[in-house]
Amino acid sequence: MLKLTKKADYGLIALKHLAVHQAGVPATVRSCSAKDIAESYGIPLPLLSKILQKLAKAGFLRSEHGTNGGYLLARDPRDITALEVIRLIDGPIFLTSCFTEHGMCSHSERCSVREPLRKVHEGILRLLSNITILDMTHDDPAPAGIPPEQLYELGGGLIAPGLRNKTI
């Protein structure tokens, strides 16, 4: 089953938290400590600290030292995608062994589902690359506020035609 690790989940939560926090406060108090974020969501502080350090090293966050120190977004939340964050924290995303770096499995020559699974794989990557941290700040029941018909397009036609007009 395709599933985000807790680390990737926590990274996305922290980035969303910082985006919301920075939007609602004066520039002088925009940073947020790892401890504050960890306590807000019940995330283990040592684990979150490592994730935030990784995000800072990759240029997603900036860390400020001192009494009012903490973390700030280093990039606009409109420019940070879920795919970038997940790849940074979890590494490459592979739906099946067909799509690993080696791209082969013992059934490659006679596989009848490789092409349909490739479409699913590409659709997932496309969808994740179209969801930004800013999108995540909107409390909308649809993923990133994307209507089902647009999910169909972003996913490369992966949603069954009967679901196109239904709320997901």
Region spans (language model):
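Residue cluster at the C-terminal edge of the helix-turn-helix DNA-binding motif
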Residues: 57-60, 88
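Alpha-helical residues within the helix-turn-helix
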Residues: 39, 56-57
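N-terminal helix-turn-helix DNA-binding core of bacterial DNA-binding proteins
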Residues: 2, 6, 12-43, 62
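Conserved segment of winged-helix/HTH DNA-binding domains
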Residues: 77-102, 117-122
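Basic amphipathic alpha-helical segments that dock to polyanions
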Residues: 18, 51-56
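C-terminal regulatory/oligomerization modules of transcriptional regulators
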Residues: 102-168
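Key DNA-contact positions within bacterial/archaeal DNA-binding proteins
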Residues: 46
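Beta-hairpin "wing" of winged helix-turn-helix
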Residues: 59-73
